[in-house]
Amino acid sequence: MGITTALLLVMLMSVHTSSYETTILKPYKEDNFRSLVAKACQFIDAHELCVSNIWTHVKESGHGLNPHSVLRAAVKEAHDKAKLAMERIPTVMMLSIRSREQVAIEDCKELVGFSVTELAWSMLEMNKLHGGGGIDLDDGSHDAAAAGGNLKTWLSAAMSNQDTCLEGFEGTERKYEELIKGSLRQVTQLVSNVLDMYTQLNALPFKASRNESVIASPEWLTETDESLMMRHDPSVMHPNTVVAIDGKGKYRTINEAINEAPNHSTKRYVIYVKKGVYKENIDLKKKKTNIMLVGDGIGQTIITGDRNFMQGLTTFRTATVAVSGRGFIAKDITFRNTAGPQNRQAVALRVDSDQSAFYRCSVEGYQDTLYAHSLRQFYRDCEIYGTIDFIFGNGAAVLQNCKIYTRVPLPLQKVTITAQGRKSPNQNTGFVIQNSYVLATQPTYLGRPWKLYSRTVYMNTYMSQLVQPRGWLEWFGNFALDTLWYGEYNNIGPGWRSSGRVKWPGYHIMDKRTALSFTVGSFIDGRRWLPATGVTFTAGLAN
């Protein structure tokens, strides 16, 4: 055990024996402080420059020599480096002449922009926690716990964006990938270091969730939002604007309505989309916050496209609908990609919207249907269709009371439902599928590990006959079998056979206590943010 790790463990023990203010914020001896700075900069190529910059940030902050000032300085350093990387990307774009490379580079600019935003949010949240507001991470208060969850969520997302950027160069000569990779490596490593330190310094003891079914609304959801979700007739919802393909609304296209919606709105903006088939690709940017799309029902209001990897696009860019503005809600809508299995990756819905909710929606495609890319997401009473890895990404996503349907793949292809992309054990990401139905029409596997720490759990879920006895599939060879976290609890149906499941070190047939840590109440602290929106959700384990 290295000196910096030992130091962090000592401080972690202190957190639980005395107040945060006296353990984490007290002045540290300069030698110990230097060890913390070194840990913040470990594995950074320009190590000495990183150390120097963090020292400068600490001095400028005026918060003294303590672990928190190092964390805040490291986040600022990551933010500054991400901004610098984003500014350099257009230069690389000017060098490329191939269309797929151009798309990949454009993706990188947007994704690094996501990281800049998420790191900025993280700095603001750290200021709330430790900037003199009197909030103590160890006092059990709502504000402290919620802010801590926000930090881990945003840092987890900021760590993943750079990977998605580089994945976009699949199918290219990758020479421009190398130019971009150098700028991104330092950002990713800095965020990884901060997550590691933050997790060790602020780990909280296990608290089991209560086993109950409640109607609850998160703090970020207003009473107006709740009442909107409970109304079954869109015509009485008093939407801000109406889209109708037949011309009987203010707009004929959804894109027109979104473009006219206010930017950075703190209030819910409701767009009612009347029944019809809308052939358009929608990209709801970060600035479009608190947008709500309401349709006339699954199969009635349909947004459809056919973008796909074989057209020279990245997976990220194939989405029929992409949402990244915070607080997005969709109700009674079908999201569809019709590219078919022969065209490989073809996303119907990509979600980078923090605190987003999807209620009574259908997401239909083949390979890579639902891209739960990042941040906190909730799906209730939804239907998901696909063939390969059709629920994938590195968001913190819960699917509850949903129906998952498999479709016919290409010959020799194997049907896999999930491919969760958790890269670090410190990321608070993963997929939880609870109280749902896996309705397999083909031999089907529950998931496979896309990244080293892939995490997916099925609980209280019905599995039909064609779910294979072994349950799960390798990505390749023994990759991630020791480090992934896959679990099942209290599943039923002919596709659930405990005796035949894989024997990987990372696979678990969970007992009740372990399962409780993956409930909405514990795994993602759902009582604070999951958008129940007036719809009953199970906070603990179902009966």
Swiss-Prot record:
Keywords recorded for this protein, A-Z: Aspartyl esterase, Cell wall, Cell wall biogenesis/degradation, Disulfide bond, Glycoprotein, Hydrolase, Secreted, Signal
EC number: 3.1.1.11
Glycosylation sites: N211, N263
Chief place where the protein resides: secreted
Record has ATP-binding as a keyword: no
Pathway field: Glycan metabolism; pectin degradation; 2-dehydro-3-deoxy-D-gluconate from pectin: step 1/5
Disulphide bond pairs: C382-C402
Localisation per UniProt entry: Secreted, Cell wall
N-terminal signal peptide: 1-19
Function: Acts in the modification of cell walls via demethylesterification of cell wall pectin.
Family: In the N-terminal section; belongs to the PMEI family. In the C-terminal section; belongs to the pectinesterase family.
Note: The PMEI region may act as an autoinhibitory domain and prevent untimely PME activity during transport.
Protein name: Putative pectinesterase/pectinesterase inhibitor 22
Source organism of this protein record: Arabidopsis thaliana
